[in-house]
Amino acid sequence: MLDNISKSNKYYLLDYCYMICLGKLVIYHSGDTLYYEGMEEWINRFNPTIALLPINGNDPSRKVAGNLNAEEAVKLSKRCNVQVVIPCHYDLFEFNTADVNEFIKAAKKYEQRFCVLELGGKFSSCEI
């Protein structure tokens, strides 16, 4: 997919995440991630417009890489002034999922704009 982006746009693969810059639109896809000190400062260097963040949390009994939980994802988005946060890492595997309704509650609580997509769903930047 990135091969089709014109040379005037940029993408960065940084550790295990992507920052995709398409003109003024900057998409941050964290991949598997846990919160760490200095995370906001690092993310804010790119001024992301949209963030795709995991919400399935960190439960060592699952024996898989841990992630942000719903509230952590929303708070991170808010602190990074992300215009729209899109949750991911839910409803894919029974043993490693989260209730997307907890994310929705947190987003409303912190007044963070969000978009919940169905599996295979689409989001248009025109919605921003």
Per-segment meaning from a language model:
Residues M1-F46, E118-I128:
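Core dinuclear metal-dependent hydrolase active-site scaffold
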Residues L34-G120:
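Cap/insert and terminal regions of metallo-dependent hydrolase folds
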